[in-house]
């Protein structure tokens, strides 16, 4: 099941230097301008391709220990279309491959817009520019 995470909750993960999550930014051109600290860029037009999905799984498996449970947090600009679609496809893949015990598929509520607003209102420096 796909879960949701708020900007406030994500801020807590980053500030506490948790090592059990990975943010995946699905925006195409906007990532180069600014993005969430340590986010991975997987540019998606409408839906993630099989090649991108396989590369993402490989990257996660190479980065995180096999015994570690990892929250994979997807977002696009507003997390109303691409973010939820990709998170759902990722979740389906986890179920088909029987690896739901390793990864959790999450959506950042409100996407990058909500994150940017939260950072601005909280005077946080958790956005990387250029």
Swiss-Prot record:
Keywords noted in UniProt: Arsenical resistance
Domain Rhodanese, chain residue ranges per copy: 17-124
InterPro entries on file: Rhodanese-like_dom, Rhodanese-like_dom_sf
An example Gene Ontology molecular-function term: protein tyrosine phosphatase activity
GO biological processes: response to arsenic-containing substance
GO cellular component: cytoplasm; nucleus
Pfam families to which the protein is assigned, alphabetical: Rhodanese
Function as written in the Swiss-Prot or TrEMBL entry: Involved in resistance to arsenic compounds.
Protein name, per record: Arsenical-resistance protein 2
Naturally occurring in which organism (per UniProt): Saccharomyces cerevisiae (strain ATCC 204508 / S288c) (Baker's yeast)
Lineage: Eukaryota, Fungi, Dikarya, Ascomycota, Saccharomycotina
Gene: ARR2
């Amino acid at each position: 099941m796909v879960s949701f995470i708020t900007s406030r909750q994500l801020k807590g993960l980053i500030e506490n230097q948790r090592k059990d999550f990975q943010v995946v930014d699905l925006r195409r051109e906007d990532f180069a301008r600014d993005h969430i600290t340590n986010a991975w860029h997987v540019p998606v037009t409408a839906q993630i391709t099989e090649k991108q999905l396989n590369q993402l799984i490989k990257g996660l498996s190479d980065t995180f220990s096999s015994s570690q449970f990892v929250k994979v947090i997807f977002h696009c600009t507003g997390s109303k279309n691409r973010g939820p679609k990709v998170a759902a496809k990722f979740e389906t893949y986890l179920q088909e491959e029987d690896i739901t015990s390793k990864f959790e598929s999450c959506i950042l509520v409100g996407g990058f817009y909500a994150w940017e607003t939260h950072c601005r209102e909280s005077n946080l420096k958790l956005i990387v520019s250029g």
